[in-house]
Amino acid sequence: MTWQGWAEIALTLSLAVAIGWPLGVFLSRVWNGEKTFLDPVMRPVEGLFYKACGVDPSKSQSWHAYALALLAFNLIGFVFVYAVLRLQGVLPLNPQGFPGLSGHLAFNTAISFITNTNWQSYAGETTMSTLSQMLVLTVQNFVSAATGATVAAALARAFVANRGEGVGNFWADLVRTTLYLLLPLAFVVAVVLAALGLPQTLAAGVTAHTLEGAEQKISLYAVASQEAIKMLGINGGGIFNANSAHPFENPTPLTNLITAISINTLGWAAFFAFGRTVLAKKDVRALVIAAFVLLFAGAVGVYATETQAPPAQVAAQVDTSANMEGKEVRFGAPATAAWVAMTTGASNGSVNGKHSSLMPLGGGIAMFLMQLGEILPGGIGSGVAIMVVMALLSVFVAGLMVGRTPEYLGKKVEAREIQFSILAVVIIPLSMLGFSGIAAVLPEALKGLMHSGPHGLSEILYAYVSGTANNGSAFAGLTANAPWWNVTLGIAMAMGRFMPIVAVLAIAGSLVTKPKLAPTAGTLPTDGGLFIGLLIGVILILGGLQFFPAMALGPIVEHFQALDAVAALR
């Protein structure tokens, strides 16, 4: 570990928060329908969408109607993506001549992209046509991110309302977030990335002649445009199998910095937008501090583990100062550690190194950050929504200790809110532990494992927590393109996406009808250090403690096995 490495990690994480603040102010204006500098261009386009679809953007929906519209939109998206992927072989813009995907792979991929997970059981450069990449995958990168933002917007309005009825209009929130925030920002970042060397072409590829005289086909796509929204939308699915470790997706340390910051920027922006919308900037600042502390601790932990020489190399007396297996030398350990924390703390899942090659404890930290609920800062809107759920549970615990009905942001927190809050946070352990337990003993599932023992179990655990948390990263030792893995991971992704969303919207529907209360002497302050500590404690207990037995059999056992193996060689 070096001071330069610490500085690089601190700078990368801090820049994402700093850039997220002004974008959050802008996003709140978009949610609230306030005037923005993009109005002269985007207002007419926005109006065309409403007119074509017969939508009245001023009509507020109940939480039931809002949730139904959200689910219907995503169901239509699933059917469309599935159909295009299955028919890929007969559709145009397929210069590579790729056939359509199998039924189970198309099912998995369609759910993966509509849920903002971007889990990939395939290698993009050898599976997806140009049309598939552009028409369905890139489009879903935009609208799946916007879908998450709509949930936070609805929840924010519920806290502001005083005995209200509706939580907003889903269609208006979706269109405005896409047109005013995601499209312009992605355009700017795409131009910057293209200028820095990322390919942007509709050509299938080029042919290169190697030093041995052989011909090599190098795949090309419109990489820069998809890379921009892949990061900004906190999606993570790469065009190339190596993802952001591939030089066409991430060629230089500068592109690495830009894309790493992009992973978290709009997640933090949603926090600040929520705070401005609910008129509680100090309270939401406490949420940001809690999330940043946990994220920074995760990055520090990964950096500490990855700058220790692997035990086997120590035993072999190999001179090494870091574990460089699975890492790009153009980035090094600090940039990889920062990326690991940022991509697993958010629901991004892109990688600039191989997570399966991390030291056992480093891989365990990556898993742990996902187990916390993807709230550091999580997806656009979905992260702050689940963080607010954690805050509701925190004030509930505090209320139990002092014997008072808890309040948060001027609303009483009662049984209905706590019931739906528990539903929102129980999905990850239910899916991860349930599916992992079955897969660990099912021969059909075990065929996909490259490794046995603790690392094999870690591959299973990582896959299901990544799918359920809508992250999408993986331990590469798992061969996931098989019916069992594609179907069960698809179910896990759908559970992890839509069950918490419906629970949060139900909370919003309950809160919106309640009166707005002024704070009293008995109200727990939710903007100070005491609450931040309580919140972090609740997150660690709910998000981490329940997974400890399973983690003890995976990365923790693997760590001690490595130490024992080295001791035996000495």
From Swiss-Prot:
Keyword Oxidoreductase: no
Pfam families: KdpA
Subcellular location, record wording: Cell inner membrane
Topology of this chain in the membrane: Multi-pass membrane protein
Protein origin, superkingdom: Bacteria
One cellular-component annotation, GO: plasma membrane
Main location: membrane
Family: Belongs to the KdpA family.
Role played: Part of the high-affinity ATP-driven potassium transport (or Kdp) system, which catalyzes the hydrolysis of ATP coupled with the electrogenic transport of potassium into the cytoplasm. This subunit binds the periplasmic potassium ions and delivers the ions to the membrane domain of KdpB through an intramembrane tunnel.
Protein name: Potassium-transporting ATPase potassium-binding subunit
